């Protein structure tokens, strides 16, 4: 089953953790000094914040999937829309590791489709602060 993903770039992670924990009624599932993630069930959202973005606000949107088949399906949908994508196997980002595909919609909004395989000890790096495929390495992911 797919889970919608929202990643916000924030200037003050601690203040935002307090705010979103109050709004969501639960603490983050993962919390680090520069990153926090809530795996919400109602609505089914992977909501993440980090201080790693270029500017405060929506860093990117995406879909977290539960299987290789779902990742392949969404990657095919992006290709059918004639949007370039950057595929990554065993990417390390947002204290997680997994397979993912990055794309940029016609408006310039970055989209991440990913399958998480497990935790990672460091924030890591991923591409796509610029349009695909000329992206520079930088992380802003869902983990």
Model-derived regions: residue spans:
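N-terminal beta-strand motif that seeds the catalytic metal site of vicinal oxygen chelate
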Residues: 1-14, 44, 60-61, 122-143
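Short secondary-structure transition/capping segments
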Residues: 41-42, 98-101, 128-129
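Residue-level structural signal for beta-strand termini and adjacent loop
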Residues: 51, 114-116
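Short acidic/glycine-enriched loop/turn segments that link adjacent beta-strands
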Residues: 32-35, 55-57, 94-99
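Core segments of cupin and vicinal oxygen chelate
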Residues: 2-46
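A short linear hydrophobic-aromatic micro-motif
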Residues: 27, 46-48, 84-89
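Vicinal oxygen chelate
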Residues: 13-14, 62-110, 118-121
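Short, charged/polar surface micro-motifs in flexible loops or helix N-caps
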Residues: 41-46, 54-56, 66-71
């Amino acid at each position: 089953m797919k889970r919608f993903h929202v990643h916000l770039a924030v200037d003050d992670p601690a203040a935002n953790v307090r705010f979103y924990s109050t709004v969501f009624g639960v603490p983050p599932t993962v919390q680090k000094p520069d990153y926090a993630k809530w795996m919400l069930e109602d609505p089914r959202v992977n909501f993440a914040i980090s201080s790693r973005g270029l500017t405060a606000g929506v860093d990117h949107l995406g879909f977290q999937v539960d299987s290789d088949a779902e990742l392949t399906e969404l990657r095919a949908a992006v290709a059918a829309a004639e949007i370039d994508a950057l595929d990554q196997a065993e990417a390390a980002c947002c204290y997680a590791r997994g397979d993912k595909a990055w794309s940029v919609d016609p408006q310039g909004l970055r989209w991440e489709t990913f399958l998480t395989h497990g935790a990672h000890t460091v924030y890591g790096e991923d591409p796509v602060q610029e349009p695909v495929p000329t992206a520079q390495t930088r992380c802003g992911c869902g983990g």
